[in-house]
Amino acid sequence: MRSSPRSVRVFKHVEPLTIGAQLHRHLRGAIIRGEFRPGQALSESEISKQYATSRQPVREAFIKLAEERLVAILPQRGTFVVKISVADVLDARFVREAIEVAVVQEAATSATPSAVKDLRDLIAQQKAVAHGRAEDFLALDEEFHRTIALSVRRAHAWRVIEGIKAQMDRIRYLSLDDATPLSVLIDQHTRIVDSIEARDPVAAANALRAHLHEIIVSLPNIAAQFPDLFESE
């Protein structure tokens, strides 16, 4: 199945993102959301037409996606969306936990009252969308974790997390209808913020670990439910 043009999307030729970086971000999101399915071929020429750009930015985007193990570039055959690797998901979760635990412990010792308020505001927004589209909740979940990192000036740490968590995000989108109830995730977020506000780094680390453990619980069921989307391991 080849990628097919939808509406033409024109990327702006402006800084700070290059056209290739903008295209990478968009294609990455489409793969994570399942708009491009594992095994699907991505046509360089069709994508360049679809996004009204030359082929060079498409090649740049494909190379970056290959580095993230979201696509495979096969000489003489083409570029294909890779299947999900359970090992990659677990490895990404391991690395993310190691980084984010350190970040949340730092937040529990130095986050400002303003940062805590920002986090509680995000939790309030999560509650407001909990009975709506799950995609809206996932966006707020992402912003919650990003805000913790930025509250202690760990923007680079968050960029590292963003770079390795794509495989985890693919699972999250597959499990929208069969995942941990959003109310549970909101309670977990609340415990994280409570621990940060209480200046308790041990409790904050434990709360974050429990939160990131959810994917380990749901992963076997998701792999069994969608076997054609996963690598045989």
Task: Tell where the protein language model's regions lie, with residue ranges.
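Alpha-helix N-cap/N′ positions at the starts of helices
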Residues: 76, 99, 121, 184-187
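C-terminal-biased regions
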Residues: 177-181, 186-190, 201, 205-233
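Short linear motifs at protein or domain termini
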Residues: 1-109, 216, 220-233
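Short helix-capping and inter-helix turn/linker motifs at the boundaries of alpha-helical repeat units
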Residues: 18, 117, 180-183
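Mobile beta-alpha loop/short-helix "lid" or hinge segments that flank ligand
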Residues: 67-72, 164-166, 180-183
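Conserved amphipathic alpha-helical segments that form helical-bundle/coiled-coil interaction surfaces
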Residues: 109-174, 186-195, 203-213
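Short, flexible turn/loop "capping" segments at secondary-structure junctions
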Residues: 40, 73-74, 141, 184-186
